[in-house]
Protein backbone atom coordinates (compact mmCIF):
# COMPACT_ATOMS: atom_id res chain seq x y z
CA UNK A 1 0.00 0.00 0.00
CA UNK A 2 1.46 3.32 -1.09
CA UNK A 3 0.27 6.42 0.76
CA UNK A 4 1.12 10.03 -0.02
CA UNK A 5 -0.10 13.16 1.75
CA UNK A 6 0.00 16.56 0.07
CA UNK A 7 -1.11 18.99 2.76
CA UNK A 8 -1.24 21.82 0.23
CA UNK A 9 -4.24 20.18 -1.49
CA UNK A 10 -6.70 21.86 0.86
CA UNK A 11 -9.59 21.37 -1.58
CA UNK A 12 -9.18 17.56 -1.42
CA UNK A 13 -10.97 16.68 1.81
CA UNK A 14 -11.33 12.91 1.27
CA UNK A 15 -8.70 10.29 0.35
CA UNK A 16 -8.34 9.36 -3.31
CA UNK A 17 -8.20 5.57 -3.65
CA UNK A 18 -6.84 3.43 -6.49
CA UNK A 19 -6.33 -0.32 -6.80
CA UNK A 20 -4.32 -2.83 -8.80
CA UNK A 21 -4.10 -6.61 -8.58
CA UNK A 22 -6.80 -9.03 -7.45
CA UNK A 23 -10.25 -7.51 -7.05
CA UNK A 24 -9.21 -4.17 -8.52
CA UNK A 25 -12.39 -3.93 -10.60
CA UNK A 26 -14.66 -4.66 -7.63
CA UNK A 27 -13.02 -2.77 -4.76
CA UNK A 28 -15.03 0.32 -3.68
CA UNK A 29 -13.11 3.55 -4.26
CA UNK A 30 -15.35 5.57 -1.95
CA UNK A 31 -13.33 5.86 1.31
CA UNK A 32 -16.55 5.50 3.33
CA UNK A 33 -17.41 2.21 1.60
CA UNK A 34 -13.94 0.67 1.31
CA UNK A 35 -12.96 -1.73 4.12
CA UNK A 36 -9.36 -0.51 4.42
CA UNK A 37 -10.24 3.17 4.77
CA UNK A 38 -13.26 2.49 7.00
CA UNK A 39 -10.97 0.58 9.38
CA UNK A 40 -8.45 3.44 9.25
CA UNK A 41 -11.19 5.90 10.13
CA UNK A 42 -12.29 3.68 13.03
CA UNK A 43 -8.78 3.74 14.51
CA UNK A 44 -8.52 7.50 14.17
CA UNK A 45 -11.97 8.21 15.60
CA UNK A 46 -11.35 6.02 18.64
CA UNK A 47 -8.39 8.33 19.22
CA UNK A 48 -10.40 11.56 18.73
CA UNK A 49 -9.30 12.28 15.17
CA UNK A 50 -12.50 13.12 13.38
CA UNK A 51 -11.54 12.84 9.73
CA UNK A 52 -8.80 11.99 7.25
CA UNK A 53 -6.02 14.53 6.67
CA UNK A 54 -6.39 16.57 3.50
CA UNK A 55 -4.55 15.58 0.35
CA UNK A 56 -4.30 11.83 1.02
CA UNK A 57 -3.78 9.49 -1.95
CA UNK A 58 -3.78 5.72 -1.41
CA UNK A 59 -2.85 3.04 -3.93
CA UNK A 60 -3.50 -0.57 -2.92
CA UNK A 61 -1.69 -3.41 -4.68
CA UNK A 62 -3.55 -6.57 -3.74
CA UNK A 63 -1.92 -9.96 -4.31
CA UNK A 64 -4.48 -11.95 -2.29
CA UNK A 65 -7.46 -13.40 -4.20
CA UNK A 66 -10.84 -12.82 -2.54
CA UNK A 67 -12.94 -15.70 -1.21
CA UNK A 68 -10.23 -18.35 -1.56
CA UNK A 69 -9.35 -19.16 2.06
CA UNK A 70 -6.24 -16.96 2.08
CA UNK A 71 -7.36 -14.39 4.64
CA UNK A 72 -7.95 -11.46 2.29
CA UNK A 73 -10.39 -9.69 4.62
CA UNK A 74 -8.04 -10.10 7.59
CA UNK A 75 -5.20 -8.62 5.55
CA UNK A 76 -7.43 -5.69 4.56
CA UNK A 77 -8.31 -5.06 8.21
CA UNK A 78 -4.63 -4.97 9.16
CA UNK A 79 -3.86 -2.67 6.21
CA UNK A 80 -6.56 -0.32 7.49
CA UNK A 81 -5.23 -0.38 11.04
CA UNK A 82 -1.70 0.42 9.89
CA UNK A 83 -3.04 3.17 7.62
CA UNK A 84 -5.02 4.79 10.44
CA UNK A 85 -2.07 4.48 12.81
CA UNK A 86 0.18 6.29 10.32
CA UNK A 87 -2.29 8.94 9.17
CA UNK A 88 -3.16 9.80 12.76
CA UNK A 89 0.48 9.56 13.94
CA UNK A 90 -0.89 7.51 16.82
CA UNK A 91 2.08 5.20 17.55
CA UNK A 92 -0.23 2.41 18.66
CA UNK A 93 1.73 -0.71 19.61
CA UNK A 94 1.43 -3.90 17.61
CA UNK A 95 -0.25 -5.76 20.47
CA UNK A 96 -2.78 -2.96 20.90
CA UNK A 97 -3.50 -2.95 17.16
CA UNK A 98 -4.48 -6.60 17.52
CA UNK A 99 -7.20 -5.50 19.97
CA UNK A 100 -8.53 -3.11 17.34
CA UNK A 101 -8.45 -5.86 14.72
CA UNK A 102 -10.47 -8.18 16.93
CA UNK A 103 -13.24 -5.62 17.27
CA UNK A 104 -13.73 -6.08 13.53
CA UNK A 105 -12.66 -9.62 12.59
CA UNK A 106 -13.76 -11.22 15.92
CA UNK A 107 -11.33 -14.16 15.68
CA UNK A 108 -7.54 -13.89 15.77
CA UNK A 109 -6.39 -16.52 13.25
CA UNK A 110 -5.98 -14.38 10.13
CA UNK A 111 -5.47 -10.92 11.63
CA UNK A 112 -2.75 -12.07 14.04
CA UNK A 113 -0.82 -13.73 11.21
CA UNK A 114 -1.26 -10.69 8.93
CA UNK A 115 -0.15 -8.29 11.66
CA UNK A 116 2.73 -10.28 13.17
CA UNK A 117 3.89 -12.34 10.19
CA UNK A 118 5.29 -15.85 10.18
CA UNK A 119 3.87 -19.04 11.69
CA UNK A 120 1.47 -17.82 14.39
CA UNK A 121 -0.69 -19.44 17.03
CA UNK A 122 -3.33 -17.29 18.74
CA UNK A 123 -6.32 -17.32 21.07
CA UNK A 124 -8.96 -14.99 22.48
CA UNK A 125 -8.99 -14.04 26.14
CA UNK A 126 -12.26 -14.87 27.91
CA UNK A 127 -13.51 -11.46 29.00
CA UNK A 128 -16.19 -10.59 31.53
CA UNK A 129 -18.44 -7.65 32.34
CA UNK A 130 -18.14 -4.45 30.35
CA UNK A 131 -15.12 -5.66 28.38
CA UNK A 132 -17.03 -8.73 27.17
CA UNK A 133 -20.03 -6.59 26.24
CA UNK A 134 -17.81 -4.24 24.23
CA UNK A 135 -16.44 -7.06 22.10
CA UNK A 136 -20.02 -8.10 21.31
CA UNK A 137 -21.00 -4.70 19.94
CA UNK A 138 -22.45 -5.26 16.45
CA UNK A 139 -19.99 -4.73 13.64
CA UNK A 140 -22.40 -2.16 12.22
CA UNK A 141 -21.51 0.08 15.18
CA UNK A 142 -17.76 -0.51 14.90
CA UNK A 143 -17.67 0.07 11.13
CA UNK A 144 -20.95 1.88 10.42
CA UNK A 145 -22.32 2.11 6.92
CA UNK A 146 -22.03 5.65 5.63
CA UNK A 147 -25.16 6.70 3.71
CA UNK A 148 -24.80 9.31 1.00
CA UNK A 149 -26.33 12.00 3.23
CA UNK A 150 -24.23 11.15 6.31
CA UNK A 151 -23.02 14.12 8.30
CA UNK A 152 -19.31 14.65 8.94
CA UNK A 153 -19.71 13.35 12.50
CA UNK A 154 -21.45 10.11 11.44
CA UNK A 155 -19.92 7.22 13.39
CA UNK A 156 -17.67 9.57 15.35
CA UNK A 157 -18.01 7.75 18.68
CA UNK A 158 -17.09 4.09 17.99
CA UNK A 159 -16.50 1.55 20.78
CA UNK A 160 -13.00 1.48 22.27
CA UNK A 161 -11.40 -2.00 22.19
CA UNK A 162 -10.73 -3.59 25.60
CA UNK A 163 -7.07 -4.22 26.41
CA UNK A 164 -5.55 -7.61 25.69
CA UNK A 165 -8.35 -9.30 23.74
CA UNK A 166 -6.03 -11.47 21.69
CA UNK A 167 -2.80 -13.27 22.50
CA UNK A 168 -0.34 -14.94 20.15
CA UNK A 169 2.97 -16.72 19.83
CA UNK A 170 5.26 -17.03 16.82
CA UNK A 171 6.41 -20.60 16.27
CA UNK A 172 9.67 -21.60 14.67
CA UNK A 173 9.78 -22.47 10.97
CA UNK A 174 12.46 -24.63 9.37
CA UNK A 175 14.27 -22.76 6.60
CA UNK A 176 13.91 -25.71 4.21
CA UNK A 177 10.09 -25.62 4.22
CA UNK A 178 8.36 -23.76 1.40
CA UNK A 179 4.65 -23.09 0.97
CA UNK A 180 2.75 -23.84 -2.25
CA UNK A 181 -0.80 -22.58 -2.78
CA UNK A 182 -3.04 -23.89 -5.55
CA UNK A 183 -5.78 -21.31 -6.06
CA UNK A 184 -8.90 -22.47 -7.97
CA UNK A 185 -10.87 -20.14 -10.22
CA UNK A 186 -13.98 -20.34 -8.03
CA UNK A 187 -14.92 -19.08 -4.58
CA UNK A 188 -16.30 -20.82 -1.52
CA UNK A 189 -18.29 -18.53 0.73
CA UNK A 190 -16.92 -18.60 4.27
CA UNK A 191 -20.47 -18.69 5.63
CA UNK A 192 -21.20 -21.85 3.63
CA UNK A 193 -17.90 -23.44 4.66
CA UNK A 194 -18.80 -22.80 8.31
CA UNK A 195 -22.39 -23.98 7.89
CA UNK A 196 -21.36 -27.49 6.83
CA UNK A 197 -19.35 -28.05 10.01
CA UNK A 198 -21.14 -30.03 12.74
CA UNK A 199 -22.19 -28.45 16.02
CA UNK A 200 -20.70 -31.37 17.94
CA UNK A 201 -17.67 -33.61 17.42
CA UNK A 202 -16.77 -36.96 18.89
CA UNK A 203 -14.12 -37.02 21.59
CA UNK A 204 -12.12 -39.42 19.42
CA UNK A 205 -11.92 -36.95 16.51
CA UNK A 206 -10.99 -34.02 18.74
CA UNK A 207 -8.24 -36.02 20.45
CA UNK A 208 -6.99 -37.10 17.00
CA UNK A 209 -6.60 -33.47 15.89
CA UNK A 210 -5.23 -32.09 19.17
CA UNK A 211 -2.53 -34.76 19.33
CA UNK A 212 -1.40 -33.96 15.81
CA UNK A 213 -1.55 -30.21 16.33
CA UNK A 214 0.82 -30.49 19.29
CA UNK A 215 3.27 -32.45 17.15
CA UNK A 216 2.87 -30.27 14.04
CA UNK A 217 3.71 -26.93 15.66
CA UNK A 218 7.00 -28.33 16.93
CA UNK A 219 7.92 -30.47 13.94
CA UNK A 220 7.67 -27.56 11.47
CA UNK A 221 10.52 -25.86 13.34
CA UNK A 222 12.86 -28.87 13.22
CA UNK A 223 15.67 -28.85 10.68
CA UNK A 224 15.89 -30.98 8.65
CA UNK A 225 12.11 -31.57 8.50
CA UNK A 226 10.84 -35.07 9.30
CA UNK A 227 8.68 -35.92 6.28
CA UNK A 228 6.70 -38.77 7.82
CA UNK A 229 6.09 -36.93 11.09
CA UNK A 230 4.80 -33.78 9.39
CA UNK A 231 2.66 -35.63 6.84
CA UNK A 232 0.91 -37.63 9.55
CA UNK A 233 0.55 -34.58 11.81
CA UNK A 234 -1.29 -32.73 9.01
CA UNK A 235 -4.09 -35.32 8.89
CA UNK A 236 -7.47 -33.93 9.93
CA UNK A 237 -10.88 -35.09 11.13
CA UNK A 238 -12.40 -31.76 12.16
CA UNK A 239 -13.03 -29.70 9.03
CA UNK A 240 -11.78 -31.24 5.77
CA UNK A 241 -14.10 -34.28 5.84
CA UNK A 242 -17.11 -31.95 6.05
CA UNK A 243 -15.95 -29.41 3.48
CA UNK A 244 -14.56 -31.77 0.86
CA UNK A 245 -17.79 -31.80 -1.18
CA UNK A 246 -17.49 -28.00 -1.61
CA UNK A 247 -14.21 -28.38 -3.51
CA UNK A 248 -14.38 -30.68 -6.56
CA UNK A 249 -11.49 -33.14 -6.63
CA UNK A 250 -10.33 -32.49 -3.06
CA UNK A 251 -10.88 -36.05 -1.74
CA UNK A 252 -8.87 -37.48 -4.65
CA UNK A 253 -6.07 -34.95 -4.13
CA UNK A 254 -5.81 -35.61 -0.39
CA UNK A 255 -5.75 -39.36 -0.99
CA UNK A 256 -3.38 -39.49 -3.95
CA UNK A 257 -0.85 -36.70 -3.36
CA UNK A 258 1.66 -38.03 -0.82
CA UNK A 259 5.41 -37.82 -0.14
CA UNK A 260 5.73 -41.14 -1.97
CA UNK A 261 3.99 -39.98 -5.15
CA UNK A 262 5.49 -36.47 -4.97
CA UNK A 263 9.01 -36.50 -3.46
CA UNK A 264 9.73 -33.29 -1.58
CA UNK A 265 6.16 -32.98 -0.30
CA UNK A 266 5.68 -32.71 3.46
CA UNK A 267 1.92 -32.33 3.70
CA UNK A 268 -1.22 -31.02 2.04
CA UNK A 269 -4.44 -29.47 3.34
CA UNK A 270 -7.15 -26.92 2.72
CA UNK A 271 -6.11 -23.31 3.23
CA UNK A 272 -8.59 -21.87 5.70
CA UNK A 273 -12.14 -22.56 4.58
CA UNK A 274 -10.96 -23.26 1.03
CA UNK A 275 -11.08 -23.69 -1.87
CA UNK A 276 -7.32 -22.99 -2.03
CA UNK A 277 -5.16 -26.04 -1.37
CA UNK A 278 -1.95 -25.52 0.60
CA UNK A 279 1.08 -27.77 0.40
CA UNK A 280 4.32 -27.75 2.37
CA UNK A 281 7.41 -28.97 0.59
CA UNK A 282 11.18 -28.87 0.58
CA UNK A 283 11.86 -29.67 -3.08
CA UNK A 284 10.25 -30.29 -6.50
CA UNK A 285 7.89 -27.35 -5.98
CA UNK A 286 6.82 -27.06 -9.63
CA UNK A 287 6.08 -30.78 -9.90
CA UNK A 288 3.99 -30.74 -6.73
CA UNK A 289 2.02 -27.68 -7.89
Where are these predicted regions, by residue range?
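ATP-binding N-lobe of GHMP and related small-molecule kinases
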Residues: 1-68, 82, 86-92, 127-128, ...
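Short beta-strand-to-turn element immediately C-terminal to the catalytic PLP-Schiff-base lysine
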Residues: 6, 114-116, 120-126, 162, ...
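Glycine-rich, charge-dense phosphate/pyrophosphate-binding loop(s)
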Residues: 220-289
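Active-site rim beta-loop-alpha module in soluble metabolic enzymes
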Residues: 180-245
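Solvent-exposed alpha-helices and their adjacent loops that cap or buttress functional pockets
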Residues: 49-52, 70, 104-105, 112-114, ...
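DPxDG-like acidic metal-binding loop motif
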Residues: 70-94, 114-125
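Active-site glycine-rich loop that binds ribose-phosphate moieties when present
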Residues: 99-106, 123, 127-172, 199-201
